[in-house]
Amino acid sequence: MTSIIKLTTLSGVQEESALCYLLQVDEFRFLLDCGWDEHFSMDIIDSLRKHVHQIDAVLLSHPDPLHLGALPYAVGKLGLNCAIYATIPVYKMGQMFMYDLYQSRHNTEDFTLFTLDDVDAAFDKIQQLKFSQIVNLKGKGHGLSITPLPAGHMIGGTIWKIVKDGEEEIVYAVDFNHKREIHLNGCSLEMLSRPSLLITDSFNATYVQPRRKQRDEQLLTNVLETLRGDGNVLIAVDTAGRVLELAQLLDQIWRTKDAGLGVYSLALLNNVSYNVVEFSKSQVEWMSDKLMRCFEDKRNNPFQFRHLSLCHGLSDLARVPSPKVVLASQPDLECGFSRDLFIQWCQDPKNSIILTYRTTPGTLARFLIDNPSEKITEIELRKRVKLEGKELEEYLEKEKLKKEAAKKLEQSKEADIDSSDESDIEEDIDQPSAHKTKHDLMMKGEGSRKGSFFKQAKKSYPMFPAPEERIKWDEYGEIIKPEDFLVPELQATEEEKSKLESGLTNGDEPMDQDLSDVPTKCISTTESIEIKARVTYIDYEGRSDGDSIKKIINQMKPRQLIIVHGPPEASQDLAECCRAFGGKDIKVYMPKLHETVDATSETHIYQVRLKDSLVSSLQFCKAKDAELAWIDGVLDMRVSKVDTGVILEEGELKDDGEDSEMQVEAPSDSSVIAQQKAMKSLFGDDEKETGEESEIIPTLEPLPPHEVPGHQSVFMNEPRLSDFKQVLLREGIQAEFVGGVLVCNNQVAVRRTETGRIGLEGCLCQDFYRIRDLLYEQYAIV
């Protein structure tokens, strides 16, 4: 049976913002990606909030924030609680993306939208899959299966194939790349022929991409000229996606002696650079065949870089000799080390800035790409500095009050410690810094308590109310206090002290440093900066070009196409091209923001609610794996809010023109108006008020018995004559084919007519009626 398929666009249509879409297949709802843009627009969150409790599963296609950036917020703040599916690299690298993004923001501003704990909680819900692994969903998703296929854009990047009962095939393919690269193979399209629905993006639909060789030569020339001119090169990259391709390319160039770059430095700078490289080493099986062969034949891990230095902060980078090439995150230049280096290096004409990614319009990197002639720009300078003077005194006073309150609470707990024996066991361990280490071994005299596994019924305490530290025991002996074994912290070096004085601690230290020990605040100023360095955009996005996208869609030949994520001009161009290729065989949709697209294959399918009295009166006939029944009922337009419905095919639903609840002008047109109202309520705008989480579905009520009209029998599940022959033989009836006609006991002939219907011929005898009954049993008759 054909399924009801709808797509609601929450973000990422007719524009280049983050991707987030709600796909409904019958009663099951998928969230396709959960991205957030570089500016953390709350419009995306507001759209997601309306549907968050309807979502049954989340499918993540890529590990970058544009595809999963809003996931920690949705789980931590909106209460998203459902299965989340992603490949293993998307799970691991997605964490690296979000860790680096959080730390990059936290280093220069008071970032409170989500925390690292929210990131961990969100990624703990992810079910990790391998490519081509078929997952059959359960519960509301019974009959649905999902399969991740390689997209070729980033490591673990996925094209999702969703199949309903082996019939409806939905393909979600955004940001794919068919070309083979150094570290990734191209996308796999062999398993994606003739899908029922293709959801794809138009980001590159009108983009003419230079050849890879030309781009590599441009990059090498730019780097050589800058380094030989005693300048530094900043390459703005992402955290753990496309940076792997550039790191492989540059490390290979550095290994080539003819290039003459061995005397210069190459560095990777982000908050999680070490973890990114280590994860890459363990995921070689997800990469290109070339890297796999290199690893298997030479036993040499391709991510064991010879020339690439890993840096976690500006202090690490300062130890790398200049001139140097630095791969720094973030690609949008809105935050992170790339922004810090851009501000430092852009005013020196010797330096070069290379942008590798077209980020969302409105970001600094996109401004530089779209306006290459602009040499003066206003930039907000953000940094975190330590508190001084009155602010520091106020902060210390607040901390002192907090500590005093905590100390009083602790003393009150210790005063009540002798209320019961059990409270002595269950009391929490004191704060690490609350007590001073006294000795290594337990002294028997202390606390007047013996060291044994058995508690004494009677305790003795000092006569005077002097608080005394009590030694706590459990089944294994004395409870260990971690503070007794701590090594005293070393004095800060002069270098670290100077960094604290200059207020650069947050930006210069690795991510794992506890910044809460130093009282700080964030300040920002806006300055006009003259860009004297050379700024170049070289495409290393890893996406298919416009012509290739159109050829791929034409090769797949989808019956329906929904175009998302791209500027309006590119979406229109791709739609016109696909209509020209497919003609009437393809339906193309270009939804607007918050619009719901009805992509149901059969248009005469309605979703209604059945009354219990009607369901109990139905007589079902089994046909293969389904049960069918004929329904005569009245469509009640007084709608009821429900979450699910029953799907009825055209011909099985009868509207009563005399329904008193329907306000119509003429009774003869009542059924037409009822259908129009039903279609409006069923396939209209799903965007209701915030509190209306469920769809509004009309109710089908039973007709009075005296008004039920008769109908001709409908024969379904038509058998094949070869199968019917086996049935006759099992019943002891001789049957054989003679000229395509099944002859039974030499008295009855069963043949298929030119119209495809089965006819029964012969004399009216006992065998004729017996064979007719056996033939009827092969059908589902309603």
Curated annotation (Swiss-Prot):
Keywords: mRNA processing, Nucleus, Phosphoprotein, RNA-binding
Pfam family, one: Lactamase_B_6
Spans through the membrane: none
GO cellular component: glutamatergic synapse; membrane; mRNA cleavage and polyadenylation specificity factor complex; nucleoplasm; postsynapse
Record region (Disordered): 407-449
Composition skew (Basic and acidic residues), residue ranges: 407-416, 439-449
UniProt GO molecular function: RNA binding
Location in or out of the cell: Nucleus
Residues bearing PTM Phosphoserine: S419, S420, S423, S660
Keyword Secreted annotated: no
Main location, first listed in the record: nucleus
Residue ranges, compositional bias (Acidic residues): 417-430
SMART domains reported in the protein's UniProt record: Beta-Casp, Lactamase_B
Substitution effect: H67A: Inhibits histone 3'-end processing
Similarity comment: Belongs to the metallo-beta-lactamase superfamily. RNA-metabolizing metallo-beta-lactamase-like family. CPSF2/YSH1 subfamily.
Assembly with partners or alone: Component of the cleavage and polyadenylation specificity factor (CPSF) complex, composed of CPSF1, CPSF2, CPSF3, CPSF4 and FIP1L1. Interacts with CPSF3, CSTF2 and SYMPK. Interacts with ZC3H3.
Protein known as: Cleavage and polyadenylation specificity factor subunit 2
Organism, scientific name: Homo sapiens
Gene (name only): CPSF2
